[in-house]
Amino acid sequence: MMREPLVSEEEEEEATEVLLVEKTKLCKRRGDEEKTEERRDDLLLLALTPMVRSKSQGTTRRVTPTPPPVDVEKPLPNGDLYMGTFSGGFPNGSGKYLWKDGCMYEGEWKRGKASGKGKFSWPSGATYEGEFKSGRMEGSGTFVGVDGDTYRGSWVADRKQGHGQKRYANGDYYEGTWRRNLQDGRGRYVWMNGNQYTGEWRNGVICGKGVLAWPNGNRYEGQWENGVPKGSGVFTWADGSSWIGSWNESSNLMRNFFDGIEKNELIVATRKRSSVDSGAGSLTGEKIFPRICIWESDGEAGDITCDIVDNVEASVIYRDRISIDKDGFRQFRKNPCCFSGEAKKPGETISKGHKKYDLMLNLQHGIRYSVGKHASVVRDLKQSDFDPSEKFWTRFPPEGSKTTPPHLSVDFRWKDYCPLVFRRLRELFTVDPADYMLAICGNDALRELSSPGKSGSFFYLTQDDRFMIKTVKKSEVKVLLRMLPSYYKHVCQYENTLVTRFYGVHCIKPVGGQKTRFIVMGNLFCSEYRIQRRFDLKGSSHGRYTSKPEGEIDETTTLKDLDLNFAFRLQRNWYQELMTQIKRDCEFLEAERIMDYSLLVGVHFRDDNTGDKMGLSPFVLRSGKIESYQSEKFMRGCRFLEAELQDMDRILAGRKPLIRLGANMPARAERMARRSDYDQYSSGGTNYQSHGEVYEVVLYFGIIDILQDYDISKKIEHAYKSLQADPASISAVDPKLYSRRFRDFISRIFIEDG
């Protein structure tokens, strides 16, 4: 028999409406769109039974006993679901709460709030398992982010606070003190390449006293501020030699060397991650030592914002040259020939009022949408992903839609071709999605370049020079989509391939306007070095020269086969690897019936004493003895050997080599007589007339324009031009002949340096 409640009907109705709310938020981590900040998400519980209160009547007090715990399963009006134990009108004990958006908490409850041990899961895949208190993450717990980052340690009010360990998805590791989700106090950070910092932190950055150690035995101990050395410090080499100095407000570090050397300076450069290789520094010291370079990066919330780079990688940031003074010491001075003033950037910045302004805005909206849409898709590629019909149209009305944001451009439609394949290619080429979007879709406008060729295509370059966007014809899109499976297989198989790196294929169609198809690809000449000469080389001679007078040729002029007056000497290993890779790439293009491609070559000329640019001789000698500096002569053999040894150090340390095939390659350019006769390219034309002038250079090169197949138009072009010139001298020839001629030409302009 049920006991009647000793309360009035009005009080019972009031108790039925009791709502227990503990409401905080936890960001659902979604790629690079939101920063991680662990907070609780909509913890909303509704009491399922009336809460009974006692009532006094005069001196009489009647109390209803607390009913025993009961297991319930109750759908709530808002679509949520609670399953678990109730006691006294509250969730109390063990229970599970499911939100309609996919969030879930399972664990212990106390008077309607998550308290004790439990687990909270988000739809994104992120989880927290550990202790709760009054509905918040508090105590000891483990958070696993959707990208694989893992934090184990102490929590206070939904935030990392106290001692904790965090393992990052990229292999880095931090253990130490946290405050409000940031490293704060004393801690140790270990990079995946073996670099390690132990010391003090403040608000997520290195600040205070600490020690930075490299795997090769070098170490720096001293004061830091905002991620860079500031104040007194000591640098010690692995051989025991060391110096002590002080970093002052003018960013000069004066130091005393302990092995007979007087003064020098430590070089620290900073950069933002969104500005690719854009560091700058000033070098005013008297001797050369390994440099410490700290790169700022826009890390995730709670992550450190600096990355450590050693010797060779740091050296490419600086634009100064070494000369020998009268005492036999090297000093850094500005190179008046190569670095007087800012480098001229090609192209016209697209600003409001430019005729391509709307097209640029549409392109940026589309790229941002495409990268974000497919970021959460995690699966292996299927054969259907390569299907040329695998394309998606999306409308972008100015007022916005359910899937697109409002914008200030015209109404347009956006087409994405094989998006999952190109996302995988970007990963393969180590292009970070955030960097990709920031470079193309950030606040900086694109620069428009007119086509240097006859295609009429337009090129758009990002302000950081990393990515190039080219408008293409429908036929070129068809060729790329047709060869996409073979292209994907080729670049996966050969890491050092020289063929163009493609990052995406898209199409824009404004309402009532024409379609514009374009391809996003890597910029071959993205470098801290100024490219002072560039050549587009096909191996043909008919019409292969620039129409500009000699006096008008500058750094932005693209020269052609008949303008080439250099032969490039490579160290034996690089020469053999180049010939092997050229053969592989040409065989791939020949199999795909591709012709009319070019080898684009960029040349940076170095003075004899600019070894600092490549991080060569100045950084090899560690003894600090004056005799070593005086005896080192920058012999070319030593340059190649040092480059190889330091590159091997980088590989063993887990970092990508600075020098790779087609990028940052040290070479010697030997001046030859200008080639005005195609016969000199033939098998009998190897006896070039040398001028005896040899230059130390840095080379960049790759195979471009690989989307032209040998179709009917090219066959007609071949027949027509054959009436006017030697058929072997024209560009439009059968792919098999083109490949053989191209390889033969490359083997003649690149020479093994004995």
From Swiss-Prot:
Annotated organism of origin: Arabidopsis thaliana
Subcellular locations according to the entry: Cell membrane
Region (Disordered): 54-77
GO cellular-component term (any): plasma membrane
SUPFAM superfamilies: Histone H3 K4-specific methyltransferase SET7/9 N-terminal domain, SAICAR synthase-like
Notes on how activity is controlled: Activated by binding to RABE1D.
Pfam families xrefs: MORN (PF02493), PIP5K (PF01504)
Family annotation (PROSITE patterns): PIPK (PS51455)
Broad EC category: transferase
Protein name: Phosphatidylinositol 4-phosphate 5-kinase 2
Annotated MORN repeat ranges: 82-104, 105-127, 128-150, 151-173, 174-196, 197-219, 220-242
Residue ranges of every copy of the PIPK domain listed in the record: 351-750
Subunit: Interacts with RABE1A, TUFA, RABE1C, RABE1D and RABE1E.
GO MF term set: 1-phosphatidylinositol-3-phosphate 5-kinase activity; 1-phosphatidylinositol-4-phosphate 5-kinase activity; ATP binding
Keywords: ATP-binding, Cell membrane, Kinase, Membrane, Nucleotide-binding, Repeat, Transferase
EC number: 2.7.1.68
Start and end residues of each stretch annotated as Activation loop: 710-731
Alphabetized InterPro entries for the sequence: MORN, PIno-4-P-5_kinase_pln, PInositol-4-P-4/5-kinase_C_sf, PInositol-4-P-4/5-kinase_core, PInositol-4-P-5-kinase_N, PInositol-4/5-P-5/4-kinase
Catalytic activity: a 1,2-diacyl-sn-glycero-3-phospho-(1D-myo-inositol 4-phosphate) + ATP = a 1,2-diacyl-sn-glycero-3-phospho-(1D-myo-inositol-4,5-bisphosphate) + ADP + H(+); a 1,2-diacyl-sn-glycero-3-phospho-(1D-myo-inositol-3-phosphate) + ATP = a 1,2-diacyl-sn-glycero-3-phospho-(1D-myo-inositol-3,5-bisphosphate) + ADP + H(+)
Role according to the record: Possesses phosphatidylinositol (PtdIns) phosphate kinase activity. Phosphorylates PtdIns(4)P and PtdIns(3)P in vitro. Doesn't phosphorylate PtdIns(5)P nor PtdIns(3,4)P2 in vitro. Does not exhibit phosphatidylinositol kinase activity in vitro.
Other remarks on this protein: Plants overexpressing PI5K2 exhibit severe dwarfism and are enriched in the plasma membrane of the root meristem.
A single GO BP: positive gravitropism
